[in-house]
Amino acid sequence: TSSCAIINGILNNKNLFYHNAVVTCDDRKKTLCQEPITIWFTGLSCSGKSTIANELDKLLNKNGYHTMILDGDNIRLGLNIDLKFSNDDRIENIRRIAEVAKLMNDAGLINIVSFISPLEINRIMAKQIIGDKFFLVYVNTSLEECEKRDKKGLYKKARNGEIKDFTGINSPFDIPKNADVIVDNIDYKECANKIYNAIEKRIKL
């Protein structure tokens, strides 16, 4: 793909050299008194990813942790405003946010990433970039329920052919094979607590 060609071209550029920071990730996490992690939410549009992510953010903040939420729509309105929904652009969308998440982990932060990220191969790519700090949460809300919640009418537009490549309708969603936590969003506070309990020992320094 063209995205891969660009990335490979950059990686093979012999005029670029990686500079190591004087203040290390270990130094930064000691300052913040926490182990950095990227909690990566995946699920259909309207599954409840952002709602649960925000509740988890509140819970972590209440317990003294330093966090940052990276939301799919917000990123597409800023950093990734040049990307659309072709296969190449979807790959680049995930690649960029994974690189941002890695940088934030290097800064000692706990990331909460809320992206549809529908394809298994793209989630694998994100995990390869982020490394062992990657923690996958699958919000397992049915397509029927997501359509009921859709106040923007996006699913209806997709079914009417007004939106192309819409995940769950005319574009696939691969159910994660190895999610660290699966939640169903029946109660978003319970979901946030379940995730918090799963990561609590991991983020304590």
At which residue positions do the language-model features occur?
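ATP-dependent NMP and nucleoside kinases share a basic, alpha-helical "lid"
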Residues: G78-D89, A101-A158, D165
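C-terminal effector/interaction modules appended to NTPase cores
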Residues: T1-C33
